[in-house]
Amino acid sequence: MIYGTGVDIVEIARFEKFLQQGNDALFDRIFTPSEIEYCSAKKHSAQHYALRFAAKESFLKALGTGLRDGISWKDMEVVNDQLGKPELRLYRRAEELFRQAGLCSCFLSLSHDAGCAVAMVVLER
């Protein structure tokens, strides 16, 4: 049974600007070290950062909490499986709230086009 859905769209140019400004504190606050390593190694790193940010926003919308109840940006991490499929790993408070809600699955889809990054999350009981 579907518990919640979340969609977010982000302008990739925002993250290009953050990268040009050398805004390391922002990246360190939002992304895990693994996400920073992954995105920084990519040719279009701003696109990858924007996608991961949109994924985290989408999860928070699907869960229905936003950044309340002690959830941190780093409690969510986007990883790719062996075939490149994106998955959302949950830690600490995000994982705790996920379990408390009786959820069993988190489906994530990412896409980008025309300067925008889009993420959709479906949470299932």
Curated annotation (Swiss-Prot):
Catalytic activity: apo-[ACP] + CoA = holo-[ACP] + adenosine 3',5'-bisphosphate + H(+)
A Pfam family per the record: ACPS
One Gene Ontology MF term: magnesium ion binding
Protein EC: 2.7.8.7
Family that this chain belongs to: Belongs to the P-Pant transferase superfamily. AcpS family.
NCBIfam families linked: acpS (TIGR00516), pantethn_trn (TIGR00556), PRK00070.3-2 (NF000832), PRK14656.1 (NF011250)
Protein name: Holo-[acyl-carrier-protein] synthase
Source organism of this protein record: Citrifermentans bemidjiense (strain ATCC BAA-1014 / DSM 16622 / JCM 12645 / Bem)
